[in-house]
């Protein structure tokens, strides 16, 4: 995994943290022939890591800053098998052929999941920090007939203080994996 500090960052554009990227990549179970859609690509952390392990990545974000940040990171890490698009994922999904999806943003999530089911996407991994979004995503996947697995991951980082060391935790992330039956 590439360390978070190596990525170009822009104020207000989120990045999936290194340890969460590692678990999410593991859940995607990527193959060199996979074509992956990254919805809500943010700073492009997942796009870069996925592209290193798959045939091609389509990255989408509705923020121009996110699109630009992802593009900068793709160039920085010499990733050529990824294309970034600006817009609403629900309107763009039908333009692409892919077999796996990573979702880092939850805008219009229920409509997006319905479209993914219509396209018979074999595996979807969705990350969320908001509990209600996690429940909504899990319920929708179950309604659509997917096998669903989910895990909540908490990461703490060590920090030296004058009297020793402490662990500082980040927000826990729910990682939802849905596999087509």
Curated annotation (Swiss-Prot):
The keyword Iron does not apply. Its EC number is 2.1.1.196. Pathway: Cofactor biosynthesis; adenosylcobalamin biosynthesis; cob(II)yrinate a,c-diamide from sirohydrochlorin (anaerobic route): step 8/10. It comes from the Archaea. It is an enzyme of class 2 (transferase). S-adenosyl-L-methionine binds at residues 16, 40-44, 61, 89. CDD domains: AdoMet_MTases. Disulfide bonds: none annotated. It catalyses: Co-precorrin-6B + S-adenosyl-L-methionine = Co-precorrin-7 + S-adenosyl-L-homocysteine + CO2. Pfam families: Methyltransf_31. Keywords: Cobalamin biosynthesis, Methyltransferase, S-adenosyl-L-methionine, Transferase. GO terms for molecular function: cobalt-precorrin-6B C5-methyltransferase activity; protein methyltransferase activity. InterPro entries: CbiT (IPR023475), Cbl_synth_MTase_CbiT (IPR014008), Cobalamin_biosynth_MTase (IPR050714), Methyltranfer_dom (IPR025714), SAM-dependent_MTases_sf (IPR029063). The keyword Transferase applies. One of its GO terms (biological process) is anaerobic cobalamin biosynthetic process. PANTHER family: COBALT-PRECORRIN-6B C(15)-METHYLTRANSFERASE (DECARBOXYLATING), COBALT-PRECORRIN-7 C(5)-METHYLTRANSFERASE. Belongs to the methyltransferase superfamily. Archaeal-type CbiT family. HAMAP family: CbiT. This is Probable cobalt-precorrin-6B C(15)-methyltransferase (decarboxylating).
């Amino acid at each position: 995994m590439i360390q978070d500090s190596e990525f170009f960052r822009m104020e207000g554009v989120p990045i999936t943290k290194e340890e969460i990227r590692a678990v999410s990549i593991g859940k995607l179970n990527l193959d060199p022939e996979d074509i992956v859609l990254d919805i809500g690509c943010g700073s492009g952390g997942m796009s870069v890591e996925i592209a290193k392990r798959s045939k091609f990545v389509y990255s989408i974000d509705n923020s121009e800053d996110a699109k630009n940040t992802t593009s900068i990171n793709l160039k920085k890490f010499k990733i050529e098998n990824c294309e970034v698009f600006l817009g609403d994922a629900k309107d763009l999904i039908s333009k692409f052929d892919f077999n796996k999806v990573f979702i880092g943003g939850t805008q219009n999530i229920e409509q997006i999941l319905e479209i993914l089911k219509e396209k018979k996407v074999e595996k979807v991994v969705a990350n969320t920090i908001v509990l209600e979004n996690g429940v909504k995503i899990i319920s929708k996947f179950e309604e659509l007939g997917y096998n669903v697995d989910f895990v909540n991951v908490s990461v703490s980082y060590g920090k030296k203080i004058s009297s020793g060391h402490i662990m500082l935790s980040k927000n826990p992330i729910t990682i939802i994996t849905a596999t087509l039956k």
